[in-house]
């Protein structure tokens, strides 16, 4: 599932440091939007160490969020799933695709108190320390705040299969032509030239423009959650 852009993470970091700083400004201007975001949204950002697509579903008073960290150059792909009832965190579930793989699960009651925790590394069950739990809770709140800003700022993630005419068949079955810059197009074409199958691409769209996020041989649609079952 590792889907980083080999050899291209530095240019992307340069672009996305500016874009992510600007996403903070989006939160300040989001109040001017009249329409509310749909219940199921996909967004994301590029951090210092990798790309992070985010899927989110808001149902009544519950927020369900899934993020996938894909490292630029080194490290392990990690999926992080969170649930909140109102503003109270109720679930943390992490899958770290390292060697050996690591799985972490923690549940919290209606008052936010820990009710269950387990860490499994290579099939061996372990307990989590209080410091580890505090760190995971902190990360959960950070990704929630980031998701809030991106959602209100109308930053949308799109992904699918790239075609020779520079169009993409998205995971939803639409055919789109991303408004990407020449560097992004050239990078996709270089990656495509070294692949026997159509590469997958992921990009972000916002009122301020579009930016390439990820390119890989693997099928991004295979692990994209669906609104009805998420």
What is the role of each PLM region?
Residues 148-166:
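Structural detector for short beta-strands of small beta-barrel domains
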Residues 3-20:
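Bacterial N-terminal signal peptides that target proteins for export
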């Amino acid at each position: 599932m590792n889907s980083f852009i080999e050899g291209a993470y530095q240019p992307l970091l340069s672009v996305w440091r500016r874009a992510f700083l600007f996403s903070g400004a989006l939160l300040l201007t989001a109040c001017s939007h009249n329409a509310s975001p749909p219940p199921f949204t996909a967004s994301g950002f590029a951090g210092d160490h990798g790309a992070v697509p985010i899927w989110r579903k808001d149902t009544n008073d519950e927020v369900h969020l899934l993020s996938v960290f894909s490292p630029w150059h080194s490290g392990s792909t990690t999926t992080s799933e969170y649930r909140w009832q109102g503003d109270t965190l109720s679930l943390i579930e992490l899958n770290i695709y390292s060697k050996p793989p690591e799985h972490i699960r923690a549940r919290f009651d209606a008052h936010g108190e820990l009710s269950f925790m387990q860490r499994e590394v290579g099939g061996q069950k372990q307990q989590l320390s209080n410091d580890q739990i505090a760190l995971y809770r902190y990360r959960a709140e950070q990704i929630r705040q980031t998701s809030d800003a991106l959602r209100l700022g109308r930053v949308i993630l799109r992904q699918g299969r790239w075609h020779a005419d520079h169009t993409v068949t998205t995971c939803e079955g639409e055919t789109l032509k991303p408004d990407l810059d020449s560097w992004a197009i050239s990078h996709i074409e270089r990656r495509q030239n070294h692949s026997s199958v159509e590469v997958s691409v992921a990009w972000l769209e916002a009122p301020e423009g579009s930016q390439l996020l990820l390119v890989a041989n693997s099928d991004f649609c295979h692990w994209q959650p669906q609104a009805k079952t998420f």
